[in-house]
Amino acid sequence: YHLFYQYNPYSTRWDAMHWGHWTSEDLLHWDYHETSFAPDEDYETGVFSGTAITDKDGSHLIMYTADYNKAPDYSTDLSEKNGVRRETQCIARGDGSQYQKYEGNPVISEKEFPEEFTIEDFRDPKLWIGKDGKYYAVTVARKKSDNLGAALLFSSENAVEWQYLDMIRENDGNFGGMWEC
């Protein structure tokens, strides 16, 4: 069993989020592993939530949110801070102990979804392999028109080249604003 978690090794605040990793044979006794992912690429200042699955070849396939935030105080309100924030979806592969980020990351960005959504709030991928053998991912995103969340569905033949399929659920305002994992 593998347990991944998010943490910031430098602070108690959201910032340079990393993925930690524990494994267990029985769910009672756990072994700590070194950090699986750190924000060490140009497109990320934090590695946020995602999904880990066993791929068709038996390796681990992980899709995670790469957060790039250059606001002075790590604020999500960048209009007043004159900063830059963008969230994209990335993949990594591994064998259970070592993981390698895909060199072509990010695999889903603003290029793959409709213009009515904002790249500042586009996160929390849920990844699976369908019965048809294709990869599917559901993410949440914020609409520009009303700042409410929506669930977006994407598909891929190879987990690298993704296409937007549909908005499968839209927030009507009765469930808060932007949705989270």
Provide a role label for each language-model segment.
Residues 1-124, 128-181:
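Beta-rich carbohydrate-recognition and catalytic domains
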